[in-house]
Amino acid sequence: MPTISQLIRKPRHEKAYREKARHLEACPQKRGVCTRVYTTTPKKPNSALRKVAKVRLTNGFEVIGYIPGEGHNLQEHSVVMIRGGRVKDLPGVRYHILRGVLDTQGVKNRKQRRSKYGAKRPK
């Protein structure tokens, strides 16, 4: 416990808050261009081939974004929109790619939670 004179000499400092999606620069979404589209495997108890893309954002940052849903049409040079939101079992993946926006198509034959996957209302 510091004395009063020690606190006068060197006051307490507020702990710096670490942003979760810092490359978005306080924006809800950002546009970017895919530089590499590939699959990766998740952390220990899980097993799958998760689809991810390395994206160069308009502000110059390069981030890894997760491609949600079944099947996608992304390839190198596709223009995508990303949002914040990490994938718990993929280290380093802190962003999601939005489906149904710009070059990314929505998920086909999606009946529930369609707005999350950019799917149109079925007839």
Curated annotation (Swiss-Prot):
Q: Which cysteines are joined by disulfide bonds?
A: none
Coiled-coil ranges per UniProt: none
Q: Does Repeat appear among the keywords?
A: no
Q: Which GO terms describe its biological process?
A: translation
Q: List residues, modification 3-methylthioaspartic acid.
A: D89
Quaternary structure per UniProt? Answer: Part of the 30S ribosomal subunit. Contacts proteins S8 and S17. May interact with IF1 in the 30S initiation complex.
Q: What does this protein do?
A: With S4 and S5 plays an important role in translational accuracy. Interacts with and stabilizes bases of the 16S rRNA that are involved in tRNA selection in the A site and with the mRNA backbone. Located at the interface of the 30S and 50S subunits, it traverses the body of the 30S subunit contacting proteins on the other side and probably holding the rRNA structure together. The combined cluster of proteins S8, S12 and S17 appears to hold together the shoulder and platform of the 30S subunit.
Q: What is this protein called?
A: Small ribosomal subunit protein uS12
Q: Highest lineage ranks of the organism?
A: Bacteria, Pseudomonadati, Pseudomonadota, Alphaproteobacteria, Hyphomicrobiales
Q: Which gene encodes it?
A: rpsL
